[in-house]
Design a protein with these regions (language model features):
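A short, N-terminal "cap"/entry segment at the start of jelly-roll beta-barrel domains
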Residues: 1-43
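Short, surface-exposed charged micro-motifs
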Residues: 35, 65, 90, 100
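Short histidine-centered beta-strand/loop micro-motifs
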Residues: 35-38, 47-48, 56-61, 77, ...
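Conserved short histidine dyad/triad with adjacent acidic residue
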Residues: 42-60, 94-95, 117
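Short hydrophobic/aromatic-rich beta-strand segments that constitute the beta-sheet cores
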Residues: 58, 75, 109-111
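Short, conserved beta-strand element in jelly-roll/cupin
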Residues: 60-75
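Short acidic-glycine-tyrosine-enriched beta hairpin
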Residues: 79-95
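Ligand-binding loop in jelly-roll beta-barrel domains
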Residues: 95-118
Length: 118
């Protein structure tokens, strides 16, 4: 079997989105997402995501590895613990995380997401 490597340097059409109105806290973030890979089970995904500044509520049912390429972001959990990341930072948001995601300056990240079927 000859399975190709997925190369993120090749441009893909991106989908433009915004956070749901009931989750938006501040700003008018515009987001683009280009999903480069989905496994046959549809439980694992990888791609590129970008956003303009804003802040919104998040509730993760999936686990996500992020590698921030540009910009600055802040994640804060419901207990008030805060994590700030800049270019080159890698981090995991585990399934079950609840809090906020804030983009301080235009950012781009690569992501890998696993969402177990229930």
């Amino acid at each position: 079997m000859n399975t190709p490597i997925i190369d993120f340097s090749h441009p893909l059409p991106a989908e433009t989105t915004t956070p749901a109105a009931d989750r938006l806290i501040d700003g008018d973030p515009r987001q683009t997402v280009a999903n480069y890979f989905a496994d046959p089970s549809q439980q694992f995904f990888a791609g590129r995501w970008s956003s303009s500044p804003g802040k919104w509520r998040i509730r993760y049912s999936e686990s996500e590895f992020c590698c921030l390429m540009t910009g600055r972001v802040v994640l804060q959990n419901l207990a008030g613990d805060r994590w700030e990341f800049g270019p080159g930072a890698g981090f995991v948001v585990p399934a079950g995380f609840e809090g906020t995601w804030e983009v301080l300056e235009d950012c781009t990240k690569f992501y890998a997401i696993f969402e177990a079927r229930t």
